Amino acid sequence: ISSEKVVPASADPADTQRMIRYEIKQIKMFKGFEKIKDVQYIYTPFDSSLCGVKLEANSQKQYLLTGQVLSDGKVFIHLCNYIEPWEDLSLVQRESLNHHYHLNCVCQITTCYTVPCTISAPNECLWTDWLLERKLYGYQAQHYVCMKHADGTCSWYQGRLPLRKEFVDI
């Protein structure tokens, strides 16, 4: 994150909302290539009450940022996205980002907030960190990967164990 600047949320002078525009140096993109090639700026609401994200600008800190590409091509992030300093990611998360996650885009992760919760399709993995630990990015997020099997179903795989034969193309 090389700089931050407070900018109007829209060109409408009656709109009093503000955004923070972070200028970034993109190191690697893991998905979304079809929507945008290179990201120079990311936007977030100015107010934390609107789920705005505060990042450290002008530091050497590197982040994993997830967000949305809006119809106007701007990349938007907020508190509900997964945003983590790269150094805080587990080894499994870093290896999976570089080698496994892109193979499993057909898998859907369903967050379990309360019981009962179930999957509704064979390509879903049930994410239980919130239910068990009351945090979204707990042990399951740090140490497991939702992976596709040869038969098209998806299930959790513990990242540091050797891959079993039933997992596809790995």
Curated annotation (Swiss-Prot):
UniProt xrefs under CDD domains = NTR_TIMP
Q: Where in the cell is it found?
A: Secreted
Q: Where is the NTR domain?
A: 1-105
Work out whether the entry's keyword set contains Transport: no
Indicate where this protein is primarily found. Answer: secreted
GO CC, one annotated term: extracellular space
Q: Name one Pfam family in it.
A: TIMP
Q: Which UniProt keywords apply?
A: Disulfide bond, Metalloenzyme inhibitor, Metalloprotease inhibitor, Protease inhibitor, Secreted
Return the annotated region ranges for Involved in metalloproteinase-binding: 6-9, 48-49
* GO biological process per UniProt: negative regulation of membrane protein ectodomain proteolysis; response to cytokine; response to hormone
What would you give as a GO molecular function for this chain, any one? Answer: protease binding
What Gene3D superfamilies does the entry give?
A: 2.40.50.120, Tissue inhibitor of metalloproteinase-1. Chain B, domain 1
Q: What does this protein do?
A: Complexes with metalloproteinases (such as collagenases) and irreversibly inactivates them by binding to their catalytic zinc cofactor.
In Swiss-Prot or TrEMBL terms, this protein is called Metalloproteinase inhibitor 4
Q: Identify the gene encoding this protein.
A: TIMP4
